[in-house]
């Protein structure tokens, strides 16, 4: 049974898809939203990804599977694995190397994912895939620069109502600047540890960390897990946990 939030997200997706089909008739609208048990989490985590410029990529299966009946994902890749690691670390307040070394592999975490133990929500910066498999660069930038899409995007975040947002390199494509124009997103003064990545606030209260693209060629621990989980722990005021 869908929750009130789920029903509202579904209604938003329908309106959004109708708009996109009129403006980009050759593209496929891909829904996203929350995995099961997202609303049950003590810390509600929203990831926002940026797809690659082709029809097929490591993240496509992820967004499509949000609307499957089952929990979990098939054919885990770098993109999906990193989200699992980050979600687990952020939700548990665990960001040290000792925690990392004790952590289970992504496929084992996936078996525990989308349960009361840990879950998250996911959004794509663009909701469009090309039917013919050609490059989507132009459509992608048309999408994120469209004011109506930006309004839909902000509304989806409001409905998901996360405690923290982690996005994959939206600043470098100018999307964060576009969202700042809405007045809903503001850049904070702090950088994300030693990475040249900026922190933001949504509606003046929800921490938003914009890090590397989730498929970037970076070390899992030093490039993603440690800096993002440390920043999240500071923002959320979480003590570093000791449980597995």
Cite the ranges covered by each PLM segment.
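Surface-exposed cleft-lining segments at the edges of enzyme active sites
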Residues: 63-73, 89-93, 127-145
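Active-site and ligand/interface coordination hotspots across diverse enzymes
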Residues: 1-92, 156, 196-200, 237-244
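A Trp-anchored, charged/polar loop motif used as the substrate-binding/catalytic surface
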Residues: 21-36, 94-108, 143-156
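Short, contiguous, well-structured surface segments enriched in hydrophobic/aromatic residues
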Residues: 113-126, 130
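C-terminal capping/extension of enzyme domains
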Residues: 1-15, 137-154, 172-244
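Proline-aspartate-enriched helix->loop->beta-strand connector
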Residues: 153-171
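Short mixed-charge
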Residues: 88-116, 185-203
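Short, solvent-exposed loop/turn segments at secondary-structure junctions
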Residues: 51-55, 126-130, 170-174, 213-217
